């Protein structure tokens, strides 16, 4: 049964109904719609629309409906109801008769759906928070197990300076911390209840909206009814949060795809997160990581689509806003899946320390150490930079590492170079010197791991 039939003398065309109906996706708001209806029934008692006995009867029926929904959410979709609000109301009327028709007094689907969606978003933020923390914990655990795994760090995908696999893991812990912080910021702004705003001008019943907001677990009620029913900033913010985090996850995936490649061979991935080829028997493809990387664009598309949907809408509610849900649901589902998959990838990863160290010793990653050595000997840095560049060219010509060049060859570029240069060029020395906060020295990495464990406990 439609909630708006009295004005019309003809039934809706089936093609329009198919376009218009939203139950196939907004059934996911069933629990929130029922919870909101229970709170609204209590509010109607305070303005003498319902008696206490009527409210108790409605609440009992709604709680029974909630249990039914929780047992089998998908069963809702088989109904021909227009949307989740229509479905809940009709089910209620089926159970309690005409009393069910009183529940919508003073309420519009406009403030109802805005409330439902905010309640759903709050729940999702809690679940996403847990998934982010679990991935951070997996990264910290992997870092702790690989503090001694020296590997090359890259700029421009060229070997730059030595780092450790632990330090690499901790970089993503920091990115995820910002992702989680953005979620909490979004929660603060969306934690205001639109219920009681009516269609656009507010409800005609003197309901205490602050009390109503409290019953629903909101921090407060919205201040303007027009804004209340047309606001979808929280949808944009969550899609933005998801998009930024998916960029981080995509970079994580790309790094590991490269590290797992035959060209780098720094890590082995578990069979649980890889697949084979239908033609080439030797293949072990990093499909889980490639899917994370690929799904990043899908989430970005949801954000762009919602921006374009909202940009030209006049106040207050417009049916265009029904487009807020499918993209949001899909994007947050995708984000959750990718967070969980990234943690699963780490669960079985094996770091190949000898190969990592071998690669770190190649590519003249200790060149900066030689420049710093010259600076310590009184050579201006820019001059030292040039000297080391020339020394690298000579080392390449000879096919040797910098530390393998004889002292006499090094002294051709600067007379201040002495025997004490060789310990400076050692791989471990390169790490040990980076002892400022956030650096790659063993002490700093160990300290960062301890701090992260404390934050995530």
Swiss-Prot record:
GO cellular component terms, semicolon-separated: cytosol
Compartments where found: Cytoplasm
A Pfam match: ASL_C2
HAMAP family according to UniProt: Arg_succ_lyase
Pathway: Amino-acid biosynthesis; L-arginine biosynthesis; L-arginine from L-ornithine and carbamoyl phosphate: step 3/3
Record keywords: Amino-acid biosynthesis, Arginine biosynthesis, Cytoplasm, Lyase
Enzyme Commission (EC) number: 4.3.2.1
Catalytic activity as recorded in UniProt: 2-(N(omega)-L-arginino)succinate = fumarate + L-arginine
Any one GO molecular-function label of the UniProt entry: argininosuccinate lyase activity
GO biological process: arginine biosynthetic process via ornithine; L-arginine biosynthetic process
Protein family (similarity comment): Belongs to the lyase 1 family. Argininosuccinate lyase subfamily.
Gene source species: Serratia proteamaculans (strain 568)
Name used for this protein in its record: Argininosuccinate lyase
